């Protein structure tokens, strides 16, 4: 049964993908609601007017009096809760909520909840494939692919959800069967006052969780939990009790659980130490919800990774080209640089730059010095990255992605990797990170 009172009035704030899923959900349950968006022509406006012509919609500057007609506002993750109109409505007693809170109230099957600064999509997809291999009727989505409310179904046996900090801000009680924060590094500092505020938002994922998984090599991922709550860890160190990790025997490295070797690392199709960590995180989450190891390992052996996430493009003249356009923050770029750097004989020629979202790039310097032959810089905040790296390696500034790839080809030597891992968002030069990745792949594939 839907846990939503139908005699109250709601307003959906934000008419993008998640906003439209809220519209469909509320309409299907006969709830009275309206829609507001700060944009004059939001992405789903035509769809709303075609399918729900009776729904009142206000576009442009948010009207506080209009918002205060509602008992509850469902705020899309793209809109900051610090927006003055939202704060004014909250001060007058209007509840601020979101689609994930509504999803959690209505989901009947167990939820695997996954957040983190990086690798969320890879681990979410992997757990979904593990569940499918085990014969479960699984629904995968949230911040990845299908909006959460569109997944609700009585047929689903397990939900695997990727959740962003923005989605978690409006989620009071998720009540996941198992929850994890994979890693935490600076991201979205244009939306948060600092790392502590971002950390607090991420940790809302643990509210009401029945089990937790955390990264034992990243103290910021460890939740404050009560006694008796089942807890599993993952990391690249040797595992002990209730832990997943790496164990080496006779020169062979294995994914392992406690004191049991599960499979050789060389059987993974996904490259780099960061992807070994992702595999271990997925195993921990799957184990927590009772997935058998044979099904999980079968899924791991066939998983080739996701587009734009350390995606192999081609080998040319002894140089491998990788598209990691999804690396829109420093932590993601570091994972790729250090993960691939430990896995290759040569060096990395890195393409970096774009919209830095207020990040501090100083943490790039050491890993770049250790793993890179050169860095090709482009985009709005390329000078900030250049200042952070300093004289650690040669820096080459370019005006386009085409020029960046050409410089990489001229610089790289056999055994090297050319890596697009920008450490920045893409909106200064591209439609989105997918557009940036697709252009990179096209340019690389056109190299003679």
UniProtKB/Swiss-Prot annotation:
Its EC number is 6.3.2.9. Gene3D superfamilies: Mur ligase, C-terminal domain (3.90.190.20), Mur-like, catalytic domain (3.40.1190.10), NAD(P)-binding Rossmann-like Domain (3.40.50.720). Pathway: Cell wall biogenesis; peptidoglycan biosynthesis. Keywords: ATP-binding, Cell cycle, Cell division, Cell shape, Cell wall biogenesis/degradation, Cytoplasm, Ligase, Nucleotide-binding, Peptidoglycan synthesis. The keyword Cell cycle applies. GO terms for cellular component: cytoplasm. ATP binds at residues 116-122. The keyword Cell cycle applies. It catalyses: UDP-N-acetyl-alpha-D-muramoyl-L-alanine + D-glutamate + ATP = UDP-N-acetyl-alpha-D-muramoyl-L-alanyl-D-glutamate + ADP + phosphate + H(+). It is found in: Cytoplasm. GO terms for molecular function: ATP binding; UDP-N-acetylmuramoylalanine-D-glutamate ligase activity. One of its GO terms (biological process) is peptidoglycan biosynthetic process. It holds the Pfam family MurD-like_N. Cell wall formation. Catalyzes the addition of glutamate to the nucleotide precursor UDP-N-acetylmuramoyl-L-alanine (UMA). Belongs to the MurCDEF family. HAMAP family: MurD. This is UDP-N-acetylmuramoylalanine--D-glutamate ligase.
